Amino acid sequence: MAAVFDDIRLEDIPVDDVDMQDLEETYAVERSIEFDRYVVVDGAPVAPEAKVGALQKVLTKLFSQAGSVVDMDVPVEEGRTKGHLFIEFEDAGAARRAIKMFNGKKLDVKHRLWVNGLDDMERYGRPDFSTEYREPVVPEFEATEYPRSWLQDETGRDQFVLQKGEMTAVFWNRNNLQPENVVEPRRNWSNSILNFSPHGTYLFSFHDQGIASWGGPQFKRLRRFAHPDVKAISMSSTEKYLVTFSSEPLEVSDEPNEACPFGPESRGHQLCIWDVATGVCVKTFALPPQQQLQWPMVKWSFDDKFCARLGPGAIAVYETEKNFQLLGGKVMKIEDVQDFSFAPKGIKLASNRPNDPPSTVMVYWTPESNNQSCKAVLIELPNRRVLRTINLVQVTDVSFHWQNQAEFLCVQVDRHTKSRKTIFTNMEICSLTAREFPFEKVEIKDRCMRFAWEPNSDRFVIISRSENVNDNPAIAKNVVSFYAPEKKVDKKGVIIDKELSIFKKWKLVRAIDGKFSNEITWSPAGRFVCVAAIGKIGSRNENIDFYDMDYPNTEKIINTATDVNATLRDVAHINYASATDYEWDPSGRYLAFWSSAWKHKAENGYKVFNLAGAIVREELITDFNNFFWRPRPDSLLSNSEKKKVRKNLKEWSAHFEEQDAMEADSATRELILKRRNWLDEWSKYREACKQTLSESGLSICDCVELSTKDEDCELVEEIRETVVEESTEEVPFFEE
């Protein structure tokens, strides 16, 4: 009989110091099944057993969009499916993508799929799992300041930002007067540069933890975008989405974390798309290994309905309104595609009906192969209809230049000779509003280095360079060429309105050789263009040239062609040896050049020029880093309203001159304000007198007409005879 010890309990015996490693290794149960690769699908059609194969085929094709499907089990009971099934994917990432893509998706009119992970079933089956609906806690609404408040400035001033060392300041532009602070200067506002959104609504700053957006009259922080170590950002066309890129892949835990904006499916990704208004991450991408990256990596359509990115042998187009799903459920497979570009505006295609919305147009190009020539292809989205294809030969590179209104597209084709020793450029210019999209070829003997369309116009400027000249850097080899459409004349010799002429032929207005210029920048308002030499610090050849393409005095123009829609005049020539960057203000009246300490330490500061090339303001600032204007949204005025403003420009000019005088001199300001007060007092006195007289039945300046208009006038007719010449002549007399 075994001994019994009533005073000894089993739980009191210490076992923590007992080594049971050998027992754990001996009896360890290996988990051979990875349950995170399985998903459970509810809501599937209940079908006869004979149609299970067809059902599996349909669902396999659907779920293959998330990843490779290894197996699909469809339970059958009493000769019919049970309405749910189990799917095994190749890896856990594919299973998570399937849950995200297809949970709640309508399969047809009567069936909606509900997708959950197999691991979730264990959690749902626990006794402590509550099935009671809990209404989510909605955070209280926080009113924000008007993000476009700077547009309400009474004098219509623009804003600009200066960065000096650790300090950043935002100013109102006051022409040649001292700038006025918008907010107090801030220290360490950003780790590096700051960026405005395309229309100036948001200001973005860089930080170790991610990106922050700022806005409103006081530039308060609006949202945070938690993406560590961001290197570059870009914005969508309508400012709805923000794209961030980090060189470090995302590290995401498997455990749910409300503070983390990323799910497990984003692990290892480096590219993120955010909703700017809410701060929510809507899409992430992994980058292809060992591939040269081109920024921006994500490009947007004019209305943000589509975004696309380039991949190996394909272009992936996503529909933003459908949770960033692939257009048509698949990528556009294009063998060896090199680059693509969206039209910056919607295009009214000639083949469409008048009431049809503007079309989204994309262009891409593929290089030459053994059996095919180089091609540039215009397509329409979302139907992927090919609008026009041009075939090219002996091509080295292709680049696209859109006119800002998407009326014209220049396909710049860099071609090589048969010996491949020399490269020259052809420009294929397409008119996108004309039927059948005609292309006009402009041939250049040299290689084009820069190309720039005039805003809202059909003229352009290029900088080219011959590859057959001396390589001595001290010799100016660049050529600046100005192009404009040829004037068209009807049979009677009358010039046809350039707005009515669809088929255009571009001609060289003037070519200016022997230049060091390497940058072209047009005024946003058009007409004026600046050509500059930037980058060679300390060089005497760093010059800035201003040109007017519509100079009114034809005696001073420098055209070599007269039958073109341009009258070219060189306005100013300026030397600024330390300039590193430049930017026009949104109005197109001022052009700022600056010297950044991020690039060199010589004469850091900025200079602002007007259209005539005169300096409006300049400052030398030690440790000066950056200068940039705040952009403006597109004008809301119609063409007729703009014409009305131009018609009354003299009246507006007088008003603006008065405002400028008031800002320039305090004494003048006081005098103008006094005169305004006197005028107001006189107007009030006159109204009071008018009211008093009206009560007596009289009106101001009552008078009795004493005579009619005809009675006041008397017609006097005077006849004068003047003898011009008098002579005497003897006339023979004939009798009858």
Swiss-Prot record:
It comes from the Eukaryota. The keyword RNA-binding applies. Residues 37-120 form the RRM domain. It is found in: Cytoplasm. One of its GO terms (cellular component) is eukaryotic 48S preinitiation complex. One of its GO terms (molecular function) is translation initiation factor binding. Keywords: Cytoplasm, Initiation factor, Protein biosynthesis, Repeat, RNA-binding, WD repeat. Residues 1-94 are annotated as: Sufficient for interaction with HCR1 and TIF32. The keyword RNA-binding applies. Residues 1-219 are annotated as: Sufficient for interaction with PIC8. InterPro entries: EIF3B (IPR011400), eIF3B_RRM (IPR034363), Nucleotide-bd_a/b_plait_sf (IPR012677), RBD_domain_sf (IPR035979), RRM_dom (IPR000504), TIF_beta_prop-like (IPR013979), WD40/YVTN_repeat-like_dom_sf (IPR015943). WD repeats lie at residues 140-182, 186-224, 226-244, 245-284, 288-328, 332-375, 443-483, 511-557, 566-604, 616-662. PROSITE patterns: RRM (PS50102). SUPFAM superfamilies: DPP6 N-terminal domain-like, RNA-binding domain, RBD. GO terms for biological process: formation of cytoplasmic translation initiation complex; translational initiation. Belongs to the eIF-3 subunit B family. RNA-binding component of the eukaryotic translation initiation factor 3 (eIF-3) complex, which is involved in protein synthesis of a specialized repertoire of mRNAs and, together with other initiation factors, stimulates binding of mRNA and methionyl-tRNAi to the 40S ribosome. The eIF-3 complex specifically targets and initiates translation of a subset of mRNAs involved in cell proliferation. Component of the eukaryotic translation initiation factor 3 (eIF-3) complex. This is Eukaryotic translation initiation factor 3 subunit B. The lineage of its organism: Eukaryota, Fungi, Dikarya, Ascomycota, Saccharomycotina. The gene is PRT1.
